[in-house]
């Protein structure tokens, strides 16, 4: 069987920005991640071994000179030594992985080790599982490249004609690397055509979160951070201070760059109650990844106004399992309120004829700040009950504490 991940940078930008943040703030931290399949999929017999073979192959995948040159040129907020010394020397270590499969076919995947190292596994695990399943269940054999390009092209025209500012964030649950590349080609071509037809009076293609494909296509690369930074910080400084402390530490590391903050890890109230004007000014916007988008827009706009900030100077990035129709609804709601943009994943990169996308994630479940300290459970609550992940006892405890604080 073909190898699925063949490029070191076939990963999302936030993996690298978070990795550098970790090296600066928690270089000795250790973490454990767990794979969650929200559909409780029963995988084919032997899938665990096939997946392990795919992931062990990554031990031979290293960053190339071309990739280092691209990252050095494109990401000035990442220092030269990080890209050209640290990443050059980085090697995937499959000993960090534990992969098992029960008699019913359910997968149990754990990643455990130094945080700066284990963070690299999330995207490869998810994209390998997704593509491997589409190969094994026959979806890949039925795939019609010309037809799927045409469908993506028409989607693109709809996006740009409706005025959406949008980029691809579909690495983790994509149909395949080749399909993600084909989708990006279609988005580029449709954007160029609509832009020409309208003299630029249309939406905007903001690029892709995938570093490798941004390099191949010479387009912008999107991404800032992930929930795990806040989830880990909670075990250090508590649920009421973790958002502020990550904002402060992130701004110390990046000095105003990569400034979209993902605020919903423990719900919206605890974030907005502790958002200072300095932090709101430092970050260029907020990413909405859960909750009812219109309600979240109202909360964000009101908070900015309370702080004396014009919301139209700030950005709201929407990324909560969107399709194009839903993005258009949100866009119309945002007009005159806040500057909006969209990151769309599965609906672009796994919306393939007669194919059911996976509903899978890899999340941080435990952490400790050094190898000599005790382990603590790491959880994520979000603004959607369906997205709550982690140790149930801790989730219940934090929810009770937050509910009591809001009374």
Each model region followed by its residue ranges:
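Glycine-rich phosphate/ribose-binding loops and adjacent secondary-structure elements
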Residues: 2, 217-407
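Ordered alpha/beta subdomains of enzyme catalytic regions
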Residues: 1-246, 251-252, 361-407
